[in-house]
């Protein structure tokens, strides 16, 4: 639904009301609404109020601490931004998600989280990972500019 929210084709409020009034199991309603409202709004709010939202300096202190503690960890795989863009990793699932994004302009939310976290894992630094994820996201995702999955805005410290 992200592209439809992003371009105003449907309001998140309308979707929330329809879900609330549906016959879906309560746990399904809660899961969808948590993702749509809480995480999405946290990311929007973070980007609105944090002037460095798209830079390493804009991350929360707990994220700085964790990323810096692991900055020099040995990585089994390291890829360039170009290798990421052209789906040239060892991971077939990641490559398929990247290809889907390039072809359809969209990727399922859980895959988008996996996609962004693997870019971090397989990049030489958090700064390069963030820049790569933002550039690929903004180039190929229909909703572009969505930092929900490339920032720490929706993550909790220590999780």
Enumerate the language-model features and the residues they cover.
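Gly/Thr-rich phosphate-binding loop signature of adenosyl cofactor/nucleotide-binding cores
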Residues: 1-108
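Active/binding-pocket-proximal capping segment
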Residues: 52-53, 60-64, 70, 112-140
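Conserved small/polar residues in nucleotide/adenosyl-binding loops
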Residues: 149-154
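N-terminal low-complexity segments that are often proline-rich with Ser/Thr-Pro
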Residues: 157-159
